[in-house]
A protein has these predicted regions:
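Intrinsic disorder/low-complexity polar-acidic segments
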Residues: 184-421
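Feature for intrinsically disordered/low-complexity regulatory segments and propeptides
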Residues: 1-193
Length: 421
């Protein structure tokens, strides 16, 4: 791990994931700070020898004097000069150091959003790291702080003058990645491993499909092959259903603590999304509480899905193309639907899917469901990942619609014009 904003790691081994998140946790700290006690050091010049800052703090705000000039030397050996990539990131991207007490912190360029939230400011300009922005931010912190001390601010707004700063340390340097409200509760990311091991005891052997970690987002997808064997023995479906769990979290306010039930058909690479559980980073919680909440929220997917597929095996479909189009349109695959995927992609998706359907053959609802569930696999690629994510949810919902409602020779809903019948 390093402190650069663009640091990331990925893999498919659970033990490697555990090592990465434990290293991340060991370097991560949460500290409560008062906003008007911050010192914002805004970069205004730099050369090969120095980085120059203007300092904005409560003293400067109260006196209305010109900001003090500080400098960071780049010639003598130091924690900074031993990592020039971080210095270059400071000069060219974040352009801000924060001092609090006796400590100095680098800042992530992603911190702009949080600084704006703390000052109750919005708009695009908050993301432009300039002296003018930093000066105005500090003035907001000071005005609000003065209102708190004079007791002219409501208790709710006063509570927002405290922030929980999440920072990481490495090689003698510290860098702030997030500033959250005072109610924020830091939850170590290694808790994901503890929850996964809990479900290993519940569902059997764990197979880690893939994981990804960066400073702002963590994701891991695991499956349970033994549970797949149990489902196969119980329901005797033509295709193997492999259940899994997708965990996502962030300690920088970019994602809630989320767990989504997944299922994958046979040897396909893409999963379909089922029920999900999510909680904000507030309050106190332990692994057992999280695991119990996940069980209550997502376990139903593992019985509801195979039961639905069993029922669809007894449903005969006379008009497979019209049925597929009607189901997907109702589920949200519409050019003018906010839940849809757009006119161009919608047409291509339906054209591609219906290309696999032979009107001369006999189809059951199960066959149609398998075609629908193949959609994310058909278009899975990095440049269309957002589309894959949409279809994972859309297709998972689609198979629970009434298939016979759409098994008609005529187009549904005023005419489906995305492909010829």
């Amino acid at each position: 791990m390093n402190l650069l904003d663009n640091w990331s790691e990925r893999g498919s081994d659970l033990s490697e994931f555990e090592a990465v998140v434990k290293e991340l946790d060991a370097s991560t700290h949460a500290r409560k700070m008062k906003l008007d006690d911050l010192k914002l050091l805004s970069v205004f010049d730099a050369d090969k020898d120095y980085v120059l800052f203007h300092t904005y703090d409560r003293e400067q705000w109260q006196s209305k004097c010109a900001p003090k000039v500080s400098r960071l030397g780049l010639t003598a050996p130091s924690a900074f000069t031993s990592n020039m990539d971080l210095v270059n990131e400071l000069i060219n991207r974040s352009k801000l150091l924060i001092n609090y007490g006796r400590n100095s912190y680098l800042t992530s360029s992603h911190l702009s959003r949080d600084l704006g939230d703390c000052a109750r400011l919005g708009g695009d300009s908050i993301y432009n790291p300039t002296e003018e922005r930093d000066r105005y931010l500090m003035s907001c912190f000071c005005v609000n702080g003065a209102a708190v001390r004079s007791k002219s601010m409501t208790k709710y707004l006063a509570s927002k003058q405290d922030c929980v700063t999440v920072y990481r340390t490495k090689d003698g340097l510290a860098k702030i990645f997030s500033m959250a409200g005072g109610a924020y509760a830091y939850l170590p990311q290694s808790s994901l491993v503890d929850v996964i091991k809990y479900f290993e005891g519940e569902l059997g052997e764990v197979d880690c499909r893939q994981w990804y970690v960066d400073h702002f987002f963590t994701q891991i997808w695991v499956e349970f092959p033994k549970k797949a064997e149990d489902i196969a023995a119980t329901y005797k479906l033509p295709d193997i259903i492999v259940p899994g769990l997708l965990f996502e979290t962030s300690d920088t306010r970019d994602c809630s603590y989320t767990c989504t039930a997944t299922y994958r058909i046979g040897t396909r690479k893409c999963y379909i999304a089922g029920d999900s559980y999510s909680r904000k980073h507030i309050g106190t919680v332990n692994v057992e509480q999280i695991a119990d909440s996940i069980k209550k929220k997502v376990y139903a997917t593992y019985t509801r899905l195979p039961e639905r597929l069993c029922a669809l095996m007894t449903v005969d479909i006379d008009n497979p193309r019209e049925t597929v189009c009607g189901i997907l349109e109702k589920a949200g695959l519409k050019a003018n639907s906010p839940r849809g995927v757009g006119k161009i992609y919608g047409k291509k998706i339906l054209d591609d899917l219906c290309g696999f359907i032979n009107p001369a053959e006999t189809y059951t609802g199960y066959d149609i469901a398998m075609q629908i569930l193949s959609l994310p696999e058909m278009i899975s690629s990095d440049e269309k990942q957002y589309l894959v994510e949409t279809l994972r949810v859309l297709c998972g919902n689609a198979i629970f619609l009434d298939f016979k409602e759409f098994d008609k020779a005529e187009p549904v809903g005023g005419g489906i014009t995305l492909l010829p019948v």
